[in-house]
Structure formats: C-alpha cells, structure tokens
Design a protein with these regions (language model features):
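An acidic-aromatic loop/edge-strand motif
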Residues: 99-104, 108-118, 169-170, 180, ...
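Terminal connector regions
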Residues: 306-340, 731-784, 843, 865-894
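Substrate-binding/catalytic cleft of secreted carbohydrate-active enzymes
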Residues: 402-580, 612, 616, 630-631, ...
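Accessory beta-strand-rich segments of carbohydrate-active enzymes
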Residues: 48-51, 98, 117-236, 263-264, ...
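Extended carbohydrate-recognition surfaces in non-catalytic/accessory domains of CAZymes
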Residues: 24-146, 204-222, 234, 252, ...
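Beta-strand-rich binding/interaction modules
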Residues: 156-158, 251-289, 293-298, 680-718, ...
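Substrate-binding clefts and catalytic carboxylate motifs of secreted carbohydrate-active enzymes
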Residues: 36-39, 45-54, 68, 73-78, ...
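N-terminal carbohydrate-binding accessory modules
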Residues: 240, 329-395
Length: 894
C-alpha cells in the first residue's frame, strides 16, 4: 500500500438559499466526496418503455406499480440486468449469446455502426427506476444527484418532475449533476427515473470492435455509480493538485485549485485555509449569487506548498508509488458546507522523439520501456471489484508496467487502484465507430465530443498512474478536431503528454505521433519480433500487437464449450474467437499442427497451445527488451477478455493463467537472460536502474534425448537499464532436429538470478514477406520442426508440498518440491492449485514459475500464494501435469 500525507483546506461562508432544479454538466461526484453522500447501487428496477404506457411524471412518483419489472443493481446494462435475473440464459456458454433477442444484427460491419435491427427489444428506450429514502440528515441541505456514466441518452425525472432532457443528457463519457433541492423529500421516499435510449450509429458511444460480440443493447444503461450528495450553499467541485518538480527531482512546488459554486441567491464571502504538515495558508474568497469561481493556491504566494523533499510517485517497477491526500472543506462559521478529497502523486512524465522518430517516455527524469497490455471490463460493464483486484495483481505479478484502455474509460475505482499499485495507465478514445467518423459529425456530435473530453480530462488529471492521453485511436482526428481537443486539455491544465492517435499517422498540428499500431494480431512465430523491420517488429512503440490466439486451459474450455462441441474445433469454438478478420483460430491451429505435429485430441491440442502461447509471448517481450531504446514500448493485445475467449489474453476469463502468462512473466524478470531467434545470441536485459557487475551467463545445449552437447559460460557486466550481448550459441555436432537450450544467469556471489529454457529446431521458421498483405499477420514460408517433442518419454516427477494456511487466513502459501528422477527432459511442467470440492483452479493464484522444464536429475522448489476464500475452508489440492508429465496429486512432505 502507498504512504499518504494529508492536505486540508477550509472555506468559510454564510448560509443562503438554493436555486431551482438544474443540471450541471461536467461535475464529477466521484472527485468530490461530500460531507453527506449515499450511493444508489441497489433498489433499481428496469423495464422496456414499450411495455410501460405511463408517462415519466407517473413513473417517477412514489408508489408507482412496478409488477413485472426486473430488479437490478447499478452499474449495469439492460442485458446485464436480464442476465443477472435469469431472464436470459448464461450468454457466455456455447452460442447462447447469438440467440439473445436483438442479436440478428449484420456481421458485415461493427454493430456500433448499425441501427438496432428490426424486432430488437432494444430499439425502445428502457426505464431505470429507483425508489429510495432520502436521509433525514439531508434536510435543509443542497441536494444533488450525480451520473458519471449514462449510455447513451436519457430523459431524467425526479419525484414527478422532468429534470433532464435527452437532447441535452447524452454521451457515454459525459458527467452530469442535477440539483434536487426543491424537489427532494428528506426522511421520506423519493424516486429517480431515467428513460434511457441506446446509442445510434452516429453517436459517440462505446464499441467492442472485434474483441468479442457486442451485446444486443449496445451496453445501454447506467455504467457508473450513482450518488446523491448533500451540502451547504457552496459546492466544491473539480479539486486538483498539480505538481512541478525541480530539475533535481527532489524538490517540488504544488498548486492546489478547486471550483467553488455558489448555489444560493446571495453573495457569499469566506476564506480558504490550507494546511500542510502543520503549516497553514489563507486567502479571502467572495462569490456572487450563482457564481462559479476557481480558487488557486500558488506556491509563489504560499511557501508551504514548496516541498524541499517531496516523496515521489513511481511506477512500481522503479520505486514506491507514494500518494498524498488533500482534503478540502467549505465552512460557514463552525458549520461545514461541503468537503472534497483528492488523492494525488508528485511526479513528472515527459515524452520525446528519439533520433529515429520513436516516442520514448520518462518519469521523474528516468526513461522507461513501456511493457503493457490492454484491459477489458466486463462485457456488461458490471462492477467486479474482486476481479479487478485480481487483474491488477496479475499485471504486477507478470512484471507489466502499463495498462491501456481503448475507450471504456472505467470507474474511479480502477484509477484509484492503479494509483496505489503503481501501474501506469494509457487511456484514450476507441476506434472503428463514430469517434473516428469525423466527416459525419454534426454540431451536436462535436459538442458531445468536446464535453466528453473536458469531463474525462478533469476526472483523470489527478491520477498519477495516468501518464498519457490518446485523443485518437486507429488514426488521428482532423486538424480542427485535434485543435479542439488540445485546447480543452490545456484549459483543464492536463499535466501529462497527449498523443494524436495509437498509429504512426502524422498530423499537421502536432506532427509525428512517434508510435505505431502495425500489428500483428494473428499468430506469428517467435522469430518474427526480431526479424521484422517494417511492421510489428521490436522497434518503436507498438501500441497494440499480439502473437495471436490464446487457448484457455482445458479446465476452462470445459466451462464454456459444451461437451458435444469440444473436439474437433467447430463453429461453437469459432464463436468464441473474435470478430471481423479474427472469426476463427485457423491460422494458429495450422501453425500448431505444422510445428508440433497434428493435434490428435483436445488434450493434445491444449498442451501444444500452451507451449505456443508461452513461446510466443516470451519472444515478443524479450525482443522489445533486447532492443531498448530502439524499441520504446509494446502493448500486448490484450491482457484479459470481457467474456470466455480463444484470442488475445494472458490469462483466461476465469482468471486461470496459462502458458502466455508465464512466458510473459519469464520475459519480464527485472534481471533476465534470454535467447534471440534472429542471430542465435544470448543477452542479458537489466530492467533495474543499478549496474550489475561480475555476472556469469551459462548456456547449455541438449539433444532431444537430453544429452548435453555444449556447455559455455562467460562473465559480463550489465549497465543499468540496458541490454548486453553475452555470447553466440553455436550448433554442436550430433544436434537432433528438435533440441533444447538452457540458460542460467548468476550474480557475483554465484546465486541464480535468472534461468530460461527454449525448445528449438534445426529447421527454422521462415516468414514469407512477399505474401504479407496487411498488419494482421505475416504468412510463413517454412515451419520449424518441433514434432520430436511428441516422442518425449513420459516422466513421473517426485513431488511433495508444504502448505502454510493458518485458520482464518485470507492468503495461503504453499511450497512444492519437484525432482525429475528420469534421464529425459520434463517438458512444460504445469502446477495447479484447485479446490477439492470443485475441479476448478482456485483463483487468483500466484505461482513463482509455471510451464517450466526440468533437466534430468534437476530439483526445484516452486512457491505459490492464493486466495483461501475459493477453498471453502479446506486446504488446496496441488496437482502436477505437463507436456510429457504423468498427472498426479502432490502429497504432503514427510
């Protein structure tokens, strides 16, 4: 957890009356926790407006009959609510999703670019209604309701009165606040009702592109928290702390600001007092009736905001993500009118173009190589805090430092947690829908785009984890739109770099983007990343790319593919691939069959798929690591999936890590020894900021039958944040077609700090560059011959376990001793931690290592930590299997 310091601000004012009901745009409730606040997460009911004949004035009155309505929670979408209450069957199982009402939209283009199909129940608006008791303590207060996420447009009613019209209340990423004071009934029942319409094809909504099917309601609903707040006459909004580091990156100056809104009909005079480490500063404030004023504390005026020894926020891979907290108070005498809290970090992010034109980022004066993945929320945008915790813990466990958000700019919980965990976030608009169809924009579209940009900039500017904003995705906006976005960012005092798009396309306004999105997205062999010099290879900053499909582990496949469709691969499998060009796993499967030999069963296919995923992800991240800072960043497409998927993830929908997860984890070791597929060299990549002297690299080559053919050891020093070549791997005599390479890195004291294991072929993968047609993938001319792996003798490992799980503990640990007693390689050893009650992995689970290989006679201890709540009070079952490993349960050590 991060450390914190508290800054307090107090504003004194006179008590006055409140104005009539009005909507305030761009006032994020989540950024200002008021003195009195309730969240309306429960008590919601929804129904199609085609089924409700009553007008909004009646729907929003207490006692309105809602028999037959669907109960739900918020955040949610219409389809999400109908799935939750079992109106619809599990859409993630088999092909249930495509049988939902409204799924008859065309597959020729993205659903976001289509009108709702005829007969869809989601052509109608849907009512979202909540009847709740307003706290008695809210009496005499200024009461507001906050909607930071409505998809897409809404008529809003409260206690029988319309307070918002769909002509104004529209935009997935806009933030709305309504003053309810004159209509609210403190201590009694109140009703809020929204008549929500799904986004049309010209609306700036959200789309799932080709990741997975788009739900038939286009995620219509309330997708962020709804809160009701009570305050005095003056409201505090948009608190912001901006830091400026001195060139020594030790001292820092802070500027604290907030918008003060006088909701009364009388002038308010007061003073703002700020405290920092026992020091206080003060300035007078006067607000005319209805006035909003930005109050600022500048360090030149208030020396208390000049910190000589600032504690900096760092990405967790570099240092501690230290967080400060500022508390703002507005008081009338001894009575608090409103409060606000803002958590922030002191850090400075800059970017520049290298001599080759590639964008490189620095934080607090240190360059860093971006190694990240793209995150996806739940398909129905439901809040899943435990799953989010697991997602972010997995990010850190693998060694990734960045998460990208293409649209779906999530709830504040997401950014609060990335701040605390020191994980960088790269948000921006989405591609492939109205967001990039600028030629079709109307004045209203432009207004929504501008308001969305302003709201999100104000919301995210305090979060130290957010280090850049992409205001274009697959391409940059035209000059007039780009200038509009840049003006809005400037007005919001956006503290970080912004980039015109995720692609390499330049603009006339800002020039080169310095990034690229040149793929691939389909399967490519490990050699691709170092061999390619024109597309997705390891140079520049690749904002989205992937070695292709990622088949979930067998136990997970059984959870979403019906038993009669599990083998051979059929259309049910393909339905869980992607969209557009990614509707099958055929390219991946062809490579699997040609490199590893034809799969003979689901189990055979799955073990080979895990080996491919491990090798593919490791090769991609290792290539970008070896080439730093010719390569400046890479974003794996993707981290996770919004539903059970066969493509683009590092762990599956059920949170089970597979081969790709552990290939990534291996590649991202802080001090790492690795092999290069392009020139058969061995390098050491140092991702720390300390020089490492007196290291030794050992490389051993083994034949398929585990005979040692070559053993080489060299000394080397490794500079900080650098990659150094250690040696070349020659091909010795007697090499089998399929062979193995084991690498070890030891420090000055002889301690093993990194090891790596490769399965290679004397027949290399070769790419057919002439047949490359687009950025999706590059076809192969020849395939490596790894079929020898099928003839590896079965190995029964010696194994024992020690479990540390005290009664009542929420976190358990286990240590597993493994030994290969045979004369053969134990290849791709997989350990599982499962519940005895269910044949499912207990997740999230954090293995030191997995999908590893053991030399003949080699012994290793592997540790794991896990969440005990999945085990129903029992100890876990530890299981071992692998490519040529006899499956067994691991017994207790004696």
């Amino acid at each position: 957890m991060s450390s914190r310091i508290t800054v307090s601000l107090v504003l004194a004012a006179a008590s006055v009356f409140l104005p009539a009901v009005q909507a305030q745009e761009g006032a994020p409730a989540a950024a200002s926790a008021s003195a009195h606040s309730i969240e309306l997460s429960h008590g919601w009911e929804i129904q199609s407006s085609c089924e409700v004949k009553a007008a909004g004035a009646d729907v929003s009155k207490s006692g309105f009959a809602t028999a037959g309505w669907h109960k739900t929670t918020v955040p949610n979408t219409v389809v999400g609510a109908l799935v939750d209450d079992k109106t619809y069957p599990d859409p993630f199982y088999g092909t249930n999703m495509k049988n939902l009402p409204g799924m008859n939209y065309s597959s020729a283009t993205f659903f976001a670019n289509q009108d709702m199909p005829e007969g869809s129940p989601f052509r109608c608006a849907w009512w979202w209604r909540n009847e709740f008791v307003m706290p008695a303590a809210f009496a005499g207060k200024n009461i507001a309701i906050h909607f930071p996420g409505i998809n897409y447009r809404a008529n809003v009613w409260f206690n029988g009165q319309k307070i918002g019209d769909a002509q104004d209340i529209r935009g997935t990423y806009r933030i709305f606040e309504f003053n309810l004071t004159q209509l609210a009934k403190a201590g009694a029942k109140n009703v809020i009702a929204l008549e929500i319409t799904a986004p049309g094809k010209q609306d700036l909504g959200l789309t799932w592109v080709d990741w997975n099917p788009t739900p038939p309601d286009k995620d219509m609903g309330i997708w962020k928290e709804v809160t009701v707040t009570a305050a005095g006459p003056v409201a505090i909004r948009n608190p912001f702390v901006k830091s400026r580091l001195h060139r020594d990156f030790t001292a820092a100056d802070l500027t604290i600001s907030a918008d003060l809104r006088n909701d009364s009909k009388t002038t308010v005079k007061g003073s703002v007092v700020a405290e920092l480490d026992g020091k206080s500063v003060k300035q007078a404030v006067e607000l005319a009736a209805g006035e909003t004023k930005t109050v600022r504390f500048e360090p030149e005026q208030f020396p208390a905001l000049q910190l000589a020894q600032a504690k900096l926020w760092w990405p967790y891979t570099i240092g501690t993500p230290y967080l400060y907290k500022a508390n703002l108070h507005f008081s009338a005498g001894n009575e608090v009118s409103d409060t606000a809290t803002v958590t922030f970090g002191i850090r400075e992010v800059t970017s520049e173009l290298t001599d080759q034109g590639y964008r490189v980022f620095s934080i607090n004066g240190r360059r860093f190589l971006i190694r990240g993945a793209a995150w996806a929320p739940d398909m129905f945008l439901r809040p899943m805090s435990k799953k989010l915790d697991a997602d972010l813990r997995y990010v850190r466990h693998m060694g990734l430092n960045t998460v990208r958000l293409e649209g779906r700019i999530d709830r504040d919980e997401f950014f609060n947690k990335t701040d605390e965990l020191g994980i960088l976030v790269m948000p921006g608009w989405t591609c492939c829908d109205a967001w990039e169809q600028w030629k079709d924009w109307t004045d209203e579209t432009r207004k929504v785009a501008a308001a969305s940009m302003a709201d999100q900039a104000r919301r995210l500017r305090n979060h130290p984890s957010v280090f850049v904003w992409l205001y274009g995705s697959d391409g940059p906006p035209p000059a007039d739109v780009e200038k509009m976005y840049l003006s809005i960012l400037s007005e919001a005092e956006w503290p970080d770099p912004s980039v015109s798009s995720a692609s390499e396309a330049p603009t006339t306004v800002t020039g080169k983007s310095g990034v690229k999105m040149t793929g691939p997205y389909e399967y490519v062999p490990p050699v691709y990343w170092l061999a390619d010099k024109q597309a997705g290879g390891a140079y520049g900053y690749n904002t989205e790319t992937s070695p292709g499909p990622a088949i979930p582990v067998l136990e997970s496949v059984k959870r979403f593919i019906p038993s009669d469709h599990r083998w051979p691969i059929d259309d049910v499998w393909n339905y869980h691939a992607g969209g557009e060009r990614f509707t099958t796993v055929n390219v991946f499967t062809d490579a699997l069959n040609r490199r590893y030999g034809p799969a003979t069963s689901l189990a055979d296919y799955e073990r080979k798929a895990q080996a491919i995923a491990y090798d593919g992800e490791r090769a991609m991240f290792e290539a970008y690591g070896r080439n730093k800072y010719t390569s400046t960043g890479v974003i794996q497409w993707m981290l996770n999936n919004a539903w059970p998927s066969l493509i683009w993830h590092l762990y599956d929908y059920y949170l089970v890590p597979g081969g790709g997860y552990f290939g990534t984890k291996k590649a991202l070791e802080p001090l790492h020894v690795q092999y290069a597929y392009d020139d058969q060299s061995v390098s050491v990549v140092n991702s720390t900021y300390q020089e490492r002297k007196g290291m030794k690299v050992r490389a051993r080559v083994y034949s398929l039958d585990a005979k040692l053919l070559q053993d080489t050891e060299v000394p080397l020093d490794v500079p900080a944040d650098a990659a150094v070549k250690a040696l070349d791997v020659a091909k010795p005599d007697g090499l089998t077609t399929t062979y193995f390479l084991r690498l070890d890195l030891r420090d000055l004291r002889g301690r093993l700090v990194s090891h790596n294991f490769y399965w290679l072929s004397t027949k290399p993968d070769t790419l057919d560059w002439a047949k490359k047609q687009d950025t999706v993938y590059t076809p192969q001319a020849e395939f490596a011959d790894l079929t020898g792996l099928n003839s590896l003798p079965a190995v029964r490992l010696e194994a024992s376990r020690v479990i540390e799980q005290p009664p009542g503990a929420t976190l358990g640990k286990a240590h597993i001793r493994l030994k290969n007693p045979s004369s053969s390689m134990a290849f791709q050893v997989r350990l599982r931690l499962a519940s005895r009650k269910e044949d499912r992995d207990a997740v999230p689970v954090f293995w030191d290592d997995n999908y590893f290989s053991l030399l003949p006679g080699e012994e290793r201890i592997v540790s794991v930590s896990y969440d005990t709540s999945q085990l129903h009070g029992a100890e876990p079952v530890i299981l071992v299997d692998g490519f040529n490993i006899t499956s067994a349960e691991v017994g207790a050590a004696h």
